[in-house]
Amino acid sequence: MSTNSDEVVYNRQLASVLAKGGPQGYFGYNESHAAIGGYSTWGPFVIWLYAIPGVLFGTGYNTVFWCNMVFGLLCWCVFTWRMDWKHQLAFALGLFCAWLPLRQIFTATSEPLHFFLLAVILAYSRAMADGKRGSTAAALLACVVETIIRPYGVVMFLFPIVYGWKKNCGRLRLAGTVAAALMSVVFSLWAMNTLAAPYSEQSLDFTVFTKMGQGDVPGAVAYFFQKLFAACVSLWADYLQPTLHGGAEQYIVDAAHGFLRVLLFMATILALCLYDTVKKRAIRGKVCSLICAATIFLAILVLYNPLQLRRYSAFLCLLLLMVAAAEDLLVAVLSVPLLVLLVFPAGFAHTDGLPAYNAGMNQQMIQVTEALQQSQDRLTDEKDPWQHTLSFAYGDVHYGYLYALPAGMGIEFDWNTYLADPENTINARYVMVNHDTEAEKRLLEEGWQVLVSTENEIVYERPL
């Protein structure tokens, strides 16, 4: 039983690539889909990268999980290969106490892939300063891939720029790096609008960039600070206060702890920068990490919402920790306040858990898989992606049952209220709902036929 609804979407897309070469149906939200292809919100590139180690693990429920073990191991090896044992120990201690990055590795989301790319960027950027051959290409390639997957990853180009700067070829290298960054962002934005399904209710807010494109710079600045202020108010009222008082939902606690950890890391790195300045030691890496972390943090609050900190804060913590551990053993002092955060507020360390096996759920999933596979076998020559897509009533049925879909089928993650409304068109051939729900009532009124029925869900098939 998965603990995150995103995990099943990653898994089924990866299974589609490994078994069929790509999704035969559509992945999307509320009956939406990409302009080109059938991939979900994150687009195809993340899934294609996971397919590289994925060929070793097949199309099972835990394929993404095992791929994350590979990316986690590669992250450690790439980042620590040039560090002495003292810095490795400081990094390991900080990593354990930070907890969020470690926890993300033991999931089936895509964060460990970004951890690996981050390790490549930082390790090879530092190698650039030592004149290591091939380091520039490796660092820039990782920056390009990270930016294509997540547009705000463009800030990571700052590391190869700063570490690779040399007086005799600095301008030429800078021009090439900036050009690569710009092309990566443009391609990433094109891919988001073309190769990925639209976001649902948690849409990206590009109002700032829209106003700037219209020449309304004062309006863009005003909107930025207005949105930032609203996000900060929400962060305090909706996340920090409930967590401090106890009894908050787990996703609220996760977001609050993510914010507290990022804040602690940034304050510590800033203090180390001041200390190193007094001691006349280099601070370029730590300054770069602060700039990148602050930029991404603001992007999350202004373009997304504070809730996204429950996931993306792990990347920010790891970014700050990696740079500090590679340059300064004093980062080990972070372990004390980080350990305090593990147990207060809300006993964060004791609420985590790996996905659990549920025998009853597994038996129902077997029935769903067999029924859908038999139905799909009759449609092998059908080219319409909607004929290979199932609409899921989110809120009525546990998303873990979606693992039962045969490899290649697409998933429309629809709200139960969306499916229950007769005004909304259902394009998919199949719909998964629960018993005695408004969504099921609509399907019955429209003459949909039961394909398979179990204790906790029913799959309906479009009437012929």
Report the location of each language-model feature:
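Hydrophobic/aromatic-rich transmembrane helices and adjacent perimembrane loops
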Residues: 11, 111, 117, 149, ...
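Loop-to-helix entry region of an early transmembrane alpha helix in multi-pass inner-membrane enzymes
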Residues: 40, 44-74, 254-263, 352
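Membrane-lumen/periplasm interface segments of specific transmembrane helices
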Residues: 173-265
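Extracytosolic helix-loop segments that constitute the early lumenal/periplasmic catalytic or substrate-binding loops
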Residues: 9-36, 45
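Short acidic/glycine- and proline-prone juxtamembrane loop motifs at membrane-interface regions
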Residues: 4, 103-113
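Transmembrane-helix motifs of polytopic, lipid-linked glycan transferases
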Residues: 63-88, 120, 269-276
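Membrane-embedded, lumen/periplasm-facing catalytic core of multi-pass transferases
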Residues: 337-400, 404-406
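Signature aromatic-anchored transmembrane alpha helix within multi-pass, membrane-resident enzymes
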Residues: 89-90, 137-141, 178-183, 321, ...
